[in-house]
């Protein structure tokens, strides 16, 4: 029997399993209608916006046909590179789109200096670091984003991410300490913190009260070790199978889920796994994830 906390959680799956925004050639034959219909078949309630999604009118039409919702959308922030004013203009346009499709959160990652799309950088060793001055600017800018988002009924969900200046627990700690809890929330991503730090519970335990959005991404530890040994890029690592959906890798999601439930988390948990759809059938992977969630989390 589901608890009230469980009923406050919506389950989604990200479009990245069907098509990848960073490598457009991957899954290019998977169109919006196929993606959304697969999500319904697999049993999920919604998805996040992919780079190939249409404008609000067309998207809302396709969503309504299938009784699906949008959980959020990634925003590439360039506060350091462009300055707060210019970056905020782009973010406000992003919020206008999100409001039009009834999304609850704006997923934000500061992308200045990122190596996640690099063809050469070792994702395990070459991450960028911000100076103290840059940290101050990012935190100030994110607070401003939070003010903008609030005008549109949205929350900022900051995404700690491999290959960026805010990747580790230590860096996320600093971000949380220097931003306003009313304005900046945390997107907790199991896979990114597991690969970055090994321990994926410490970050959640430290900042559970700031979590406004969740990504459930599994990790194949043997593939991770292989990718580390080869010094692969981020894209090379996920094409090599480092990430997968819950139930197909080595992470235990039960303590994560139990922690969220115990703290009355309200919001989306989105299954996300960067994979090559030609090797990992998106619908099959979505069904594996849904089965795992139902059997090992909700009904356990």
Curated annotation (Swiss-Prot):
The keyword Lipid metabolism does not apply. GO terms for biological process: inositol catabolic process. Disulfide bonds: none annotated. InterPro entries: IolE (IPR023952), IolE/MocC (IPR030823), IolE/XylAMocC-like (IPR050312), Xyl_isomerase-like_sf (IPR036237), Xyl_isomerase-like_TIM-brl (IPR013022). It catalyses: scyllo-inosose = 3D-3,5/4-trihydroxycyclohexane-1,2-dione + H2O. Its EC number is 4.2.1.44. GO terms for molecular function: manganese ion binding; myo-inosose-2 dehydratase activity. Signal peptide: none annotated. Gene3D superfamilies: Divalent-metal-dependent TIM barrel enzymes. Pfam families: AP_endonuc_2. Its cofactor is glutathione; Co(2+); Mn(2+). Belongs to the IolE/MocC family. This is Inosose dehydratase. It comes from Lactiplantibacillus plantarum (strain ATCC BAA-793 / NCIMB 8826 / WCFS1) (Lactobacillus plantarum).
């Amino acid at each position: 029997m589901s608890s009230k906390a469980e009923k406050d959680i919506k389950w989604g799956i990200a479009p990245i399993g069907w098509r990848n925004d960073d490598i457009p050639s991957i899954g290019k034959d998977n169109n919006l209608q196929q993606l959304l219909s697969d999500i319904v078949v697999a049993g999920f309630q919604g998805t996040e916006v992919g780079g190939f999604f249409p404008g609000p009118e067309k998207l809302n039409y396709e969503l309504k046909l299938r009784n699906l919702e949008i959980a959020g959308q990634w925003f590439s922030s360039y506060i350091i590179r462009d300055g707060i004013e210019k970056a905020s203009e782009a973010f406000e346009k992003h919020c206008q789109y999100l409001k039009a499709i009834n999304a609850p959160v704006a997923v934000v990652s500061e992308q200045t200096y990122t190596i996640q799309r690099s063809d050469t950088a070792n994702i395990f060793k070459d991450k960028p670091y911000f100076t103290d001055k840059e940290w101050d600017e990012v935190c100030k800018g994110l607070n401003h984003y939070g003010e903008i988002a609030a005008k549109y009924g949205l929350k900022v969900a900051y995404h700690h991410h491999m290959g960026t200046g805010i990747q580790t627990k230590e860096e996320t700690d600093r971000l949380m300490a220097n931003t306003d809890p009313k304005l900046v929330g945390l997107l907790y991503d199991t896979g990114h913190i597991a690969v970055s730090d090994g321990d994926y519970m410490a970050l959640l335990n430290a900042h559970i009260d700031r979590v406004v959005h969740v990504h459930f991404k599994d990790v194949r530890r043997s593939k991770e070790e292989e990718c580390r040994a080869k010094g692969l890029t981020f894209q090379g690592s996920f094409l090599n199978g480092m990430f997968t959906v819950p139930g197909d890798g080595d992470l235990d999601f039960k303590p994560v889920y139990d922690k969220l439930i115990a703290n009355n988390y309200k919001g989306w948990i989105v299954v996300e796994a960067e994979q090559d759809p030609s090797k990992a059938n998106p619908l099959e992977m979505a069904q594996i994830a849904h089965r795992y969630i139902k059997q090992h989390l909700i009904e356990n």
